[in-house]
C-alpha cells in the first residue's frame, strides 16, 4: 500500500496525457 495506487503504469508514464487519473514520476517506480 502507498502512493503507488495513484500512479499510472510505467507504460503510460511515457505520455502523461494518457494517465490523468494518476501520477508518473520516479517515486511511482517509473524512469520518467
UniProtKB/Swiss-Prot annotation:
Name under which the protein is recorded: Delta-actitoxin-Eqd1a
InterPro entries named in the record: Neurotoxin_3_Actiniidae, Neurotoxin_3_Anemonia
Any one GO CC term of the record: nematocyst
The keyword Nucleus belongs to this UniProt entry's keyword annotation: no
Recorded family membership: Belongs to the sea anemone short toxin (type III) family.
Organism: Entacmaea quadricolor
Job description of the protein: Binds specifically to sodium channels (Nav) of the axonal membrane of crayfish and prolongs the falling phase of the action potential. It also increases the maximum rates of rise of both action potential and resting potential. Is only active on crustaceans.
Post-translational modifications reported in the UniProt record: Contains 4 disulfide bonds.
Lineage: Eukaryota, Metazoa, Cnidaria, Anthozoa, Hexacorallia
